[in-house]
Amino acid sequence: MHKEFKRTIPGSLKLLKRVLSEWQKLMTPVFWDYKNDAPWWYNERALLSLFAGAIWQSNGWAFEEFTTDKWRMTRQGDRKKGKGRGDIMFGISNTNFVTEAKQCWPILERKSNNALKTLTKAIENAQSEASRLPLYGKRLGIVFATPRLHENNLPYEDEILESFTKGLRKMKNTTLAWFFPAEKRTLNGKDGYRYPGIVLLIKRFAG
């Protein structure tokens, strides 16, 4: 029997505490057959829909895939407004948020440094992209991370996840939630990797 790894860390975004918990519930075996399928095996758009579901379950509202203005930097270093796509705008307890979402697939190894660097780069990129959005609310970068474990490292799976999640807990100024189920952790791809669970990272752009 594997060990379950499951935690939420709201950090400074206390309003999202319930959203994180509801999101974890949507990852559980009640909704998915892990032997053949799991939500974290899908793309950013599909995962964003489950995040929206968690918001609605938390008595909030969500508006996805909308056209919006976005700022970009010209070669001359000036800011120029153009049209773009917003991933999700949502509200909780009279506070509004507008976000940029990304997805990444870090490789888990005996040492977690490289996987954590992949996550750090991804959330920083999402946070930077969020800075281009209009001030419809607090601007957030969101990352859905689906870690993958090579079949050669399967005997050390729990040990590797222990090290990885310990590193997650040390990430600064980042709202986090993760779920690696204990049962039926057998989602194996044809690429020689296992996909044991998912991490959600959220970081606010405060500029």
Task: Pin down the residues of each PLM region.
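Surface-exposed cleft-lining segments at the edges of enzyme active sites
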Residues: 33-37, 71-75, 104-115
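A short acidic/basic microdomain associated with nuclease active sites
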Residues: 56-81, 87-91
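Interdomain/boundary linker segments immediately adjacent to catalytic/signaling cores
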Residues: 1-57
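Hydrophobic, Leu/Ile/Phe/Ala-enriched alpha-helical segments that form helix-helix packing faces
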Residues: 19, 23-27, 51-55, 59, ...
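Glycine-rich, aromatic-bearing surface loops/beta-hairpins
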Residues: 137-207
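Glycine-rich, often proline-containing surface loops adjacent to acidic residues and nearby aromatics
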Residues: 25-26, 96-98, 140-142
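Conserved catalytic cores of phosphodiester-cleaving nucleases, focusing on short active-site segments
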Residues: 87-109
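Catalytic cores of nucleic-acid endonucleases
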Residues: 101-162
